[in-house]
């Protein structure tokens, strides 16, 4: 039992080294070919592709809404359980491992990779949409009422709070533990080693990693495309700049160029630096909105949002007997499928930067800290938007007309609107750069067979691919092409839900083995156990 996780497989042993690259055979080759075929097909038949993928996405959501909701609840409970159990003392990388990044830089990278851009896009638009019945109201509450306002904030927190971060935490902890503590490659397949042992390095593992690569690059490319549209829309709204395809392509070129520079510089010189800049700029904007908006009333807004979140988290996470099917299928199940499809990317990136933390520290940081930050952010921005709607102030008073402009419409009614809106555009772009460069590092690691130090040309290849895909889809197929690829990424959420549930079982098996046979709480040396506990 002590040698249960020993394997003769060596990281990179299946790799092909040519053209300055270090490519896993066959994951790199198959992923590249399939991505190319999907993009070409979508460019040639954008409307047909969108219709087909929308159909598969709709089928997944309509028939398996219960599975997404149940799985989301399981992930949250599983993470909370790990905080309480003795396995929480296990340190990622072994008892002597030290964190590679300061707490502040670590938090900044977690947040920027996880959902920073989403908070810019939806922090005003989503509560406003729920309050005005743009696409259903949570739990069927009457729109444009005080109760509807409270529930709009609570439901928004539900979609951006514990559940999505629990999804990321399961993947991230599984990858980090099996890589740093068991010596397995840092790829999705390694999480299944407890079940299938060395078969993980065969075609079963190849398929899992290929799907993870495709979900990641499709998700990143579509987000980059939609982000370019939002940034272009913001520039047009503020400065009258044409928001057409030329502006959008220029934004993509700029974002991709900076992302390439960042991935060349690596985690320390690129991703960490941009994430710290992100956190600083976001904090400035947040403090401004609080100061000129709610002021000291922000504490009431936070209590209002937190209270609604706590009161409604169970009803919102349950599908039985609900009459708001339009809402929970259109919003909640969609979000859960999207978070799950993004989990290979975000989870692997979090694993990359989390060595040296204990399991307990890891779960608290990944699950609770972002939830608290999101609570403050949503209370400030979402609360300000709803307050303007209730007071009949500005364009938001007429409801949500253009989701991408809701943030700018809210800022337009505050002092120094031009400056703060310009800062918001910069934040949108920098958040996209951090998503692109961290995503490129993740895809690079998977397609290099789990290597953390793949050659620079390989990093450049994937960062360039993301920009080319986004630009080509915008230029050739517009919103239909982007929507098709987004629907394809979300469709991956259904099979990956089962993958994540299996990960929970495998992770617990691995942690239990580590506690008993490696840390010595069963038969091994007591000193390591004491060291682990004292350092937790």
Question: Model-predicted segments: where are they?
Answer:
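N-terminal alpha-helical transmembrane segments of multi-pass membrane transport
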Residues: 1-146, 264, 287, 504-511, ...
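Transmembrane alpha-helical segments of multi-pass small-molecule transport proteins
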Residues: 3-6, 30-44, 69-77, 239-265, ...
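Flexible loop linkers connecting adjacent transmembrane helices
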Residues: 8-18, 51-57, 85-103, 128-154, ...
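Membrane-water interface regions at transmembrane-helix termini and the short interhelical loops
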Residues: 15-20, 45-60, 79-100, 152-159, ...
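Transmembrane-helix boundary/entry motifs in multi-pass membrane transporters
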Residues: 17-26, 61-65, 95-113, 153-162, ...
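Helix-loop-helix module between adjacent transmembrane segments
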Residues: 19-43, 76-79, 115-119, 159-229, ...
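Hydrophobic alpha-helical segments of multi-pass membrane transport proteins
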Residues: 34, 67-84, 282-293, 373-383, ...
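Membrane-embedded translocation segments of transport machinery
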Residues: 200-357, 364, 369-421, 429, ...
């Amino acid at each position: 039992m002590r040698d249960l996780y020993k394997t003769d497989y060596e990281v990179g042993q299946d790799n092909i080294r040519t053209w300055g690259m270090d490519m896993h055979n066959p994951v790199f080759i198959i992923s590249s070919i399939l991505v190319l075929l999907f993009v070409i097909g979508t460019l040639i038949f954008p409307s047909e592709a969108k219709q087909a993928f929308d159909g598969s996405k709709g089928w997944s959501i309509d028939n398996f809404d219960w599975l997404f909701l149940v799985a989301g609840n399981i992930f949250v409970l599983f993470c909370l359980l790990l905080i309480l159990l003795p396995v929480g003392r296990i340190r990622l990388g072994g008892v002597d491992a030290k964190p590679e990044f300061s707490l502040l830089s670590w938090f900044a990278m977690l947040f920027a990779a996880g959902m920073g851009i989403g908070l810019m896009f939806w922090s005003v638009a989503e509560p406003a949409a729920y309050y005005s019945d743009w696409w259903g109201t949570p739990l069927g509450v009457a729109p444009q009422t005080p109760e509807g306002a409270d529930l709009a904030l609570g439901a928004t927190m539900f979609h951006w709070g514990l559940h999505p971060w629990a999804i990321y935490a399961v993947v991230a902890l599984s990858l980090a533990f099996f890589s740093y503590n068991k010596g397995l490659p840092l790829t999705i397949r390694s999480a299944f080693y407890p079940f299938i042992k060395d078969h993980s390095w065969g075609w079963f593992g190849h398929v899992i990693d290929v799907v993870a690569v495709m979900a990641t690059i499709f998700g990143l490319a579509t987000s980059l495309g939609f982000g370019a549209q939002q940034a272009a829309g913001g520039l047009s709204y503020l400065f009258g700049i044409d928001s057409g395809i030329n502006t959008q392509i220029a934004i993509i070129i700029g974002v991709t160029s900076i992302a390439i520079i960042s991935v060349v510089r690596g985690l320390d010189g690129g991703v960490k630096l941009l994430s710290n800049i992100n956190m600083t700029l976001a904090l400035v904007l947040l403090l401004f909105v609080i100061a000129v908006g709610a002021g000291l009333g922000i504490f009431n807004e936070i209590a209002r949002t937190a209270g609604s979140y706590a009161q409604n988290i169970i009803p919102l996470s349950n599908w039985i007997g609900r009459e708001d099917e339009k809402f929970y299928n259109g919003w909640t199940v969609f979000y859960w499928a999207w978070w799950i499809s993004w989990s290979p990317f975000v989870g692997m990136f979090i694993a990359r930067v989390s060595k040296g933390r204990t399991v307990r520290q890891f779960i608290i940081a990944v699950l609770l800290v972002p939830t608290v930050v999101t609570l403050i952010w949503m209370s400030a921005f979402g609360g300000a938007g709803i307050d303007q709607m209730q007071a009949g102030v500005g364009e938001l008073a007429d409801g949500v007309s253009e989701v991408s402009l809701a943030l700018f419409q809210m800022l337009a009614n505050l002092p120094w609107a031009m400056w703060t809106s310009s800062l918001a555009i910069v934040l949108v772009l920098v958040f996209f750069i951090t998503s692109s460069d961290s995503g490129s590092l993740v895809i690079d690691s998977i397609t290099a067979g789990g290597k953390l130090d793949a050659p620079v040309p390989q990093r450049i290849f994937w960062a360039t691919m993301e920009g080319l895909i986004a630009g080509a889809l915008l230029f050739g197929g517009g919103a239909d092409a982007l929507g098709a690829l987004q629907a394809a990424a979300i469709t991956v959420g259904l099979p990956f839900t089962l993958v994540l549930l299996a990960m929970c079982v495998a992770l617990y098996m691995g942690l239990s083995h580590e506690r008993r046979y490696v840390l010595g709480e069963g038969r091994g040396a007591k000193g390591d156990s004491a060291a682990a506990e004292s350092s937790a």
